[in-house]
Amino acid sequence: MNAKKISLIILGAGGRGTIYANLARLMPEKMEISAVAEPREFFRERLAAEHHIPRENVFSDWHEVLKRPKFADGVIICTQDRMHAEPAVAFAEHGYHILVEKPLGVDPDECRRVVEAVQKNHVMLSVCHVMRYANYTRILRDLISRGGIGQIISVEHLEPVGHWRFAHSYVRGNWRREDESSPVLLAKSIHDLDWISYIVGDHCRTVSSFGSRMFFRGENRPEKAADRCLDCPLESECPYSAPRFYLERFRKGPIDNYVESVCGELSEANILKAMREGPYGRCVFACDNDVADHQVVNLEFASGATAVFTLAGCSRYGERRTVIFGSAGEIRCDGHKIELYSYLRDRVTEIDIEPDSRTPFSYHNGGDKGCLESFVDALRTDDPSRIVTGAEVSLETHNMVFAAEISRQEKRTVLLQELTGRRK
């Protein structure tokens, strides 16, 4: 394919922005990172240095980018949840193609504004529902399309977030409050609902959901617990100990985005200071969090097929686990291995996922790389069909989440058609 190299701007140089920038370096013949906008100096300067970005293309605010004439092909939006829709609309109006981290917006109106903006300005939009692009997803869909289990009847899908990851992001961290970010289902698991819909291959019609902030509450705080882990006499016995999460992981390695996000420039002194003064050193029972720590979502599709999704914050971290029940067999999978059981033959066939999906950059089982590459290939060939998570598809997925939240809060079953009529 004789196509040009695509130039991309990164908005938000945190964990997700850094991942996409690093993935771009694996495909230098297809793309390059030409600019970055990030308010935090350490993260901004690090990404700029690693990608040799010219000083004139290094910005502390994304608004500054738009003061210049268009100088890149696309933008990757990896800002905080409540900072996705505004830049998406603005960059669409300036003719940039857009790859945006989920969620597209935090309510139906925000999502619709983004979709209308990209359609009006004839730019491509891809939303990072990365699980659609994972290697095992392609294998699963191929098995199902070839009739491996007959007609899909029901799906069970579990996301064990992991107790320490949940505490980091949704109790102490940036996604702990709905008014500052979004509900946990939207922030963490929208691509799970999207993936279920993609696997079933049908439109969701009805949703119900249950969940709450059951455990990470002040009334569950042990009697002798301190406000901060560094002062707490129970720290060594607590599974949510901040020193164990951050300090020990820093000392033992390897360093990951969770440790790095605590203080930016890593040193033992900086981590201790962050735990003493910042949000990540707080007792998990003494935070200002309000998002649910567990949730189930029940889905009914137009065909009559059903699915249940479970988000477990208090859990051992592990791969997502799925069971797909069909009329002629069932599939069990965890992202690394697929088990196909035939009712007729009473036999299990095991399928290992191809090794090339387990590279150092195989986030979401290769889905992150696949999502970025499909977006760039769409731009290089002027072929939006290469994007499988475009505007209307993503809008439907977001409405599934919004319906689930209405159900959870109002204690009722919600029809998806209700969302199409909701306007502020």
Residue ranges and their predicted role:
Residues 15, 81, 85, 113, ...:
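Catalytic cores of eukaryotic secretory-pathway lumenal/extracellular enzymes that build
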Residues 19, 51, 291-424:
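C-terminal helical cap and adjacent loop that interface with cofactors, partners, or active-site loops
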Residues 35, 74, 154:
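Short, Asp-centered acidic motifs that coordinate Mg2+ and/or phosphate
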Residues 113-130, 150-155:
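Rossmann-fold dehydrogenase core element
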Residues 1-53:
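N-terminal Rossmann-like dinucleotide-binding module
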Residues 53-117:
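Beta-loop-alpha module in the N-terminal Rossmann-like domain of NAD(P)-dependent dehydrogenases
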Residues 131-281, 411:
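Predominantly a Rossmann-like dinucleotide-binding segment in NAD(P)-dependent oxidoreductases
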